[in-house]
Amino acid sequence: MTQEKKDFTIHALPVLKDNIIWIWEASGQAVVVDPAVSEPVKEFLSQNNLALNSVLQTHHHDDHIGGTRDLISNWPSASIIACKTDLERIPFQTHSVTDQEVFTLFGYSVKVLEVPGHTRGHVAYYLSDTNADNRNPALFCGDTLFAGGCGRLFEGTPHEMFKSLKLLNSLPSNTKIYCAHEYTESNLHWANHLYPEDLLIKKRLEYVSSQRANGLLSLPSTIAEERKTNLFFRARTLEQFSQFRKHKDNWMS
Protein backbone atom coordinates (compact mmCIF):
# COMPACT_ATOMS: atom_id res chain seq x y z
CA MET A 1 0.00 0.00 0.00
CA THR A 2 1.43 3.38 -1.02
CA GLN A 3 1.82 5.90 1.76
CA GLU A 4 0.43 9.37 1.17
CA LYS A 5 3.17 11.94 0.76
CA LYS A 6 3.19 14.48 3.55
CA ASP A 7 4.22 18.12 3.29
CA PHE A 8 7.58 18.53 4.98
CA THR A 9 10.21 21.00 6.14
CA ILE A 10 13.91 20.38 6.74
CA HIS A 11 15.37 22.33 9.67
CA ALA A 12 19.03 22.97 10.46
CA LEU A 13 20.12 22.60 14.09
CA PRO A 14 23.71 23.82 14.62
CA VAL A 15 25.45 22.10 17.54
CA LEU A 16 28.94 21.74 18.97
CA LYS A 17 31.57 23.70 17.05
CA ASP A 18 30.40 23.17 13.48
CA ASN A 19 28.01 20.19 13.35
CA ILE A 20 24.62 20.48 11.71
CA ILE A 21 21.85 18.12 12.77
CA TRP A 22 19.15 18.05 10.09
CA ILE A 23 15.56 17.58 11.27
CA TRP A 24 13.08 16.51 8.61
CA GLU A 25 9.60 17.40 9.89
CA ALA A 26 6.21 16.28 8.63
CA SER A 27 2.76 16.00 10.24
CA GLY A 28 3.95 16.29 13.82
CA GLN A 29 6.79 13.81 13.41
CA ALA A 30 10.51 14.18 12.84
CA VAL A 31 13.36 12.31 11.22
CA VAL A 32 16.69 13.33 12.76
CA VAL A 33 19.91 12.96 10.80
CA ASP A 34 23.16 12.26 12.67
CA PRO A 35 22.32 13.52 16.18
CA ALA A 36 25.72 14.41 17.60
CA VAL A 37 24.10 15.35 20.90
CA SER A 38 20.60 14.86 22.25
CA GLU A 39 19.62 17.84 24.39
CA PRO A 40 19.23 20.40 21.55
CA VAL A 41 17.24 17.83 19.58
CA LYS A 42 14.92 17.08 22.50
CA GLU A 43 14.44 20.80 23.08
CA PHE A 44 13.63 21.41 19.40
CA LEU A 45 11.17 18.52 19.25
CA SER A 46 9.48 19.65 22.46
CA GLN A 47 9.19 23.28 21.37
CA ASN A 48 7.66 22.23 18.06
CA ASN A 49 5.43 19.46 19.44
CA LEU A 50 7.17 16.80 17.38
CA ALA A 51 7.58 13.08 18.05
CA LEU A 52 10.70 11.29 16.91
CA ASN A 53 9.87 8.98 14.02
CA SER A 54 13.34 7.88 12.92
CA VAL A 55 17.05 8.58 13.10
CA LEU A 56 19.21 8.36 9.98
CA GLN A 57 22.85 7.56 10.73
CA THR A 58 25.39 8.13 7.97
CA HIS A 59 28.41 6.68 9.81
CA HIS A 60 29.73 5.65 13.21
CA HIS A 61 31.74 8.67 14.41
CA ASP A 62 30.70 9.91 17.83
CA ASP A 63 29.92 13.42 16.60
CA HIS A 64 27.17 11.79 14.52
CA ILE A 65 25.79 9.11 16.85
CA GLY A 66 26.60 10.62 20.25
CA GLY A 67 23.03 11.65 21.04
CA THR A 68 21.19 8.67 19.62
CA ARG A 69 21.03 6.41 22.68
CA ASP A 70 19.46 9.17 24.77
CA LEU A 71 16.91 9.87 22.03
CA ILE A 72 16.04 6.16 22.00
CA SER A 73 15.42 6.28 25.76
CA ASN A 74 12.90 9.07 25.20
CA TRP A 75 11.31 7.64 22.02
CA PRO A 76 11.83 3.86 22.27
CA SER A 77 9.63 3.13 19.24
CA ALA A 78 11.72 5.28 16.89
CA SER A 79 13.49 3.54 14.03
CA ILE A 80 17.28 3.83 13.97
CA ILE A 81 18.44 3.39 10.38
CA ALA A 82 22.11 2.71 9.63
CA CYS A 83 24.41 0.74 7.36
CA LYS A 84 24.36 -3.02 7.93
CA THR A 85 28.15 -3.24 7.62
CA ASP A 86 28.44 -0.89 10.62
CA LEU A 87 26.21 -2.97 12.88
CA GLU A 88 29.05 -3.59 15.34
CA ARG A 89 29.89 0.12 15.54
CA ILE A 90 26.26 1.29 15.54
CA PRO A 91 24.77 -1.60 17.54
CA PHE A 92 21.54 0.20 18.44
CA GLN A 93 20.31 0.34 14.85
CA THR A 94 16.86 -1.19 14.39
CA HIS A 95 16.82 -1.13 10.59
CA SER A 96 20.05 -2.19 8.88
CA VAL A 97 20.25 -1.00 5.28
CA THR A 98 22.45 -1.81 2.29
CA ASP A 99 23.52 -0.09 -0.91
CA GLN A 100 20.66 0.81 -3.30
CA GLU A 101 18.02 -0.24 -0.78
CA VAL A 102 14.89 1.90 -0.89
CA PHE A 103 12.59 2.56 2.06
CA THR A 104 9.77 5.01 2.69
CA LEU A 105 9.51 7.93 5.11
CA PHE A 106 6.57 10.32 5.16
CA GLY A 107 5.42 8.75 1.89
CA TYR A 108 8.69 9.51 0.09
CA SER A 109 11.17 6.99 -1.25
CA VAL A 110 14.62 7.18 0.32
CA LYS A 111 17.48 5.42 -1.47
CA VAL A 112 20.58 4.26 0.38
CA LEU A 113 23.88 5.06 -1.34
CA GLU A 114 27.06 3.45 -0.04
CA VAL A 115 29.76 6.15 -0.17
CA PRO A 116 32.90 4.79 1.54
CA GLY A 117 36.01 6.91 1.92
CA HIS A 118 35.63 8.92 5.10
CA THR A 119 34.75 5.65 6.83
CA ARG A 120 34.24 2.13 5.50
CA GLY A 121 30.54 1.94 6.34
CA HIS A 122 29.49 5.44 5.31
CA VAL A 123 26.13 5.82 3.58
CA ALA A 124 24.10 8.71 2.19
CA TYR A 125 20.32 8.96 2.01
CA TYR A 126 18.81 10.26 -1.22
CA LEU A 127 15.24 11.55 -1.31
CA SER A 128 14.39 11.68 -5.01
CA ASP A 129 10.66 11.39 -5.73
CA THR A 130 9.84 15.02 -4.98
CA ASN A 131 9.33 16.42 -8.49
CA ALA A 132 5.56 16.10 -8.43
CA ASP A 133 5.54 18.32 -5.35
CA ASN A 134 7.80 20.96 -6.95
CA ARG A 135 10.54 20.19 -4.45
CA ASN A 136 14.22 19.64 -5.00
CA PRO A 137 15.65 16.17 -4.44
CA ALA A 138 17.51 16.00 -1.12
CA LEU A 139 20.75 14.29 -0.14
CA PHE A 140 21.79 13.67 3.47
CA CYS A 141 25.46 12.87 2.93
CA GLY A 142 27.12 13.09 6.35
CA ASP A 143 30.87 13.62 6.00
CA THR A 144 31.36 12.36 2.44
CA LEU A 145 30.54 15.54 0.53
CA PHE A 146 30.81 19.00 2.06
CA ALA A 147 29.99 22.36 0.52
CA GLY A 148 33.26 23.16 -1.21
CA GLY A 149 34.98 20.03 0.06
CA CYS A 150 34.85 16.38 1.07
CA GLY A 151 35.60 14.31 4.15
CA ARG A 152 39.05 13.25 5.26
CA LEU A 153 40.03 9.67 4.51
CA PHE A 154 40.09 8.15 7.99
CA GLU A 155 39.36 4.58 6.91
CA GLY A 156 38.92 4.52 3.15
CA THR A 157 41.21 5.01 0.18
CA PRO A 158 41.45 7.86 -2.33
CA HIS A 159 39.98 5.51 -4.94
CA GLU A 160 36.94 4.79 -2.76
CA MET A 161 36.28 8.46 -2.04
CA PHE A 162 36.82 9.46 -5.68
CA LYS A 163 34.29 6.80 -6.72
CA SER A 164 31.83 7.93 -4.03
CA LEU A 165 32.04 11.54 -5.15
CA LYS A 166 31.55 10.51 -8.78
CA LEU A 167 28.37 8.74 -7.72
CA LEU A 168 27.06 11.83 -5.94
CA ASN A 169 28.12 14.01 -8.87
CA SER A 170 25.81 11.96 -11.08
CA LEU A 171 22.72 13.05 -9.13
CA PRO A 172 20.43 15.72 -10.61
CA SER A 173 21.91 19.22 -10.53
CA ASN A 174 19.06 20.63 -8.43
CA THR A 175 19.62 18.12 -5.61
CA LYS A 176 19.99 19.92 -2.29
CA ILE A 177 22.99 18.82 -0.23
CA TYR A 178 22.46 18.51 3.51
CA CYS A 179 25.96 17.74 4.78
CA ALA A 180 26.83 17.39 8.45
CA HIS A 181 29.34 20.21 9.02
CA GLU A 182 29.57 23.93 8.31
CA TYR A 183 33.02 23.89 6.71
CA THR A 184 32.16 25.90 3.60
CA GLU A 185 34.10 29.08 4.26
CA SER A 186 37.30 27.23 5.15
CA ASN A 187 36.95 24.94 2.15
CA LEU A 188 36.52 27.87 -0.21
CA HIS A 189 39.46 29.75 1.30
CA TRP A 190 41.57 26.71 0.46
CA ALA A 191 40.19 26.52 -3.09
CA ASN A 192 40.73 30.25 -3.56
CA HIS A 193 44.31 29.84 -2.36
CA LEU A 194 44.94 27.26 -5.09
CA TYR A 195 42.98 29.08 -7.80
CA PRO A 196 43.00 32.81 -6.97
CA GLU A 197 41.85 33.74 -10.48
CA ASP A 198 38.79 31.48 -10.44
CA LEU A 199 35.91 33.95 -10.35
CA LEU A 200 33.28 31.34 -9.50
CA ILE A 201 35.16 30.27 -6.38
CA LYS A 202 35.93 33.87 -5.44
CA LYS A 203 32.30 34.95 -5.81
CA ARG A 204 31.02 32.05 -3.76
CA LEU A 205 33.61 32.68 -1.05
CA GLU A 206 32.52 36.31 -0.80
CA TYR A 207 28.88 35.27 -0.48
CA VAL A 208 29.57 32.58 2.12
CA SER A 209 31.84 34.88 4.14
CA SER A 210 29.04 37.45 4.23
CA GLN A 211 26.54 34.82 5.34
CA ARG A 212 28.77 33.58 8.12
CA ALA A 213 29.65 37.11 9.28
CA ASN A 214 25.92 37.68 9.73
CA GLY A 215 25.47 34.48 11.71
CA LEU A 216 23.79 32.60 8.86
CA LEU A 217 24.50 29.12 7.53
CA SER A 218 25.86 28.49 4.05
CA LEU A 219 23.87 25.25 3.81
CA PRO A 220 22.21 23.49 2.12
CA SER A 221 24.21 23.57 -1.09
CA THR A 222 23.30 21.98 -4.43
CA ILE A 223 24.97 19.53 -6.78
CA ALA A 224 25.07 22.31 -9.40
CA GLU A 225 26.98 24.63 -7.07
CA GLU A 226 29.45 21.92 -6.11
CA ARG A 227 30.15 21.15 -9.76
CA LYS A 228 31.19 24.77 -10.22
CA THR A 229 33.23 25.48 -7.09
CA ASN A 230 34.16 22.23 -5.30
CA LEU A 231 37.65 21.19 -6.41
CA PHE A 232 37.08 17.58 -5.34
CA PHE A 233 33.98 17.44 -7.54
CA ARG A 234 35.90 19.07 -10.37
CA ALA A 235 38.78 16.57 -10.19
CA ARG A 236 38.84 14.62 -13.46
CA THR A 237 41.23 11.87 -12.42
CA LEU A 238 42.04 9.87 -9.31
CA GLU A 239 45.53 11.35 -9.36
CA GLN A 240 44.19 14.91 -9.35
CA PHE A 241 41.73 14.09 -6.57
CA SER A 242 44.50 12.51 -4.49
CA GLN A 243 46.69 15.58 -4.94
CA PHE A 244 43.86 17.86 -3.83
CA ARG A 245 43.13 15.68 -0.79
CA LYS A 246 46.77 15.56 0.28
CA HIS A 247 47.16 19.32 -0.15
CA LYS A 248 43.97 20.04 1.79
CA ASP A 249 45.03 17.71 4.62
CA ASN A 250 48.23 19.71 5.09
CA TRP A 251 46.82 23.18 4.43
CA MET A 252 46.56 25.79 7.16
CA SER A 253 44.30 28.77 6.51
Swiss-Prot record:
Chain sites annotated for binding Zn(2+) 1: H59, H61, H118, D143
Positions contributing to Zn(2+) 2 binding: D63, H64, D143, H181
Cofactor: record remark: Binds 2 Zn(2+) ions per subunit.
SUPFAM superfamilies xref list: Metallo-hydrolase/oxidoreductase (SSF56281)
Pathway membership, UniProt: Secondary metabolite metabolism; methylglyoxal degradation; (R)-lactate from methylglyoxal: step 2/2
NCBIfam families tied to this protein: GSH_gloB
Protein name: Hydroxyacylglutathione hydrolase
Protein source organism: Prochlorococcus marinus (strain MIT 9211)
